[in-house]
Amino acid sequence: MKRKQTDTDLIHACMYDMLCLLGCGVNGTIPPKALLEKYRTENRTCGEEPEAAQERQLYLYRVSQAHFVDALTGTVLKQAGVSLFPDWAQSIAKAVRKEILFDAERTKLFSFMEQNGIWYLPLKGIILKEYYPAVGMRQMSDQDILFDETYAQDVKQYMVSRGYKVESYGENHHDVYEKNPVYNFELHRSLYTSSHKQVWAAYYKNIKEKLLLQDRVSYGQQMADEDFYIFMVSHAYKHYDGQGTGIRTLLDFYVYLQAKTELDFSYIETECRKLEIEAFEKDSRVLCKKVFGENAVNTIGSLGDEERNMLSYYLGSGVYGSRQQMVTG
């Protein structure tokens, strides 16, 4: 007798479908017909009732949402002709709107900093989103910016004048400002402090000396491609070694490595060794290509035991590192 599919089975299947959809989304490929049919609620070609597809679609949405990639997986399904239930379709529209609003607000903040001689460095998702295929595909909850802490009070006054609520100021290595409907800015005075790994705090203490001036501005800074990647790895490991980090982190690695094909890995490996993250960098670099590469349908099936464990850990963590059950009622 055929075993009845349990919720755990369904979640597990949806997780691997999510990986396939993410790979298709960033590689610009079409998902397999069999996968699409599982989530198609209209014009179905199999004899299964549409309610089964609706249930699967809901689970896939919840799994994707837990990893903050629901806009990307939903967009891939939608572009392939799969009708999405209203909440999912709305989440895609919200992700696009949020990125547009963040971009406009960030431009105003940078203009203020330029006018007042304050150097600044956009971090993490602000940079990474540019390597995703379309607006809204790389979802973000906040904006991370490193800036000259000498001007922290001036920046605070500016943010308050713009209607922001000061959630945190001078209490940590970053100040936090929030404003409706979606704005959340984390303005970093430093990248790491002694509360993190001592070697990280020491390595990044004088980071300004390694920064490069952006084109067409006077105070906007950027990291060299290799240094940005190294910081990506350290930030990812901070969460990975703590409460966990979701699959979006592994996807970020893949997207960045696909965009930057001429990175100096001799330098990267040397610096990662200093930061005690060399093994994590290598393992994540290899794994992301096996999971999201265009031959992933074959390479996922041939993962070694340690690679499977690492992938399971990524999949078992929400984007902010919760190791609790992701899919709830």
Language-model features: where?
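Conserved NTP-donor binding/palm subdomain of two-metal-ion nucleotidyltransferases/polymerases, i.e.
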Residues: 2-141, 147-329
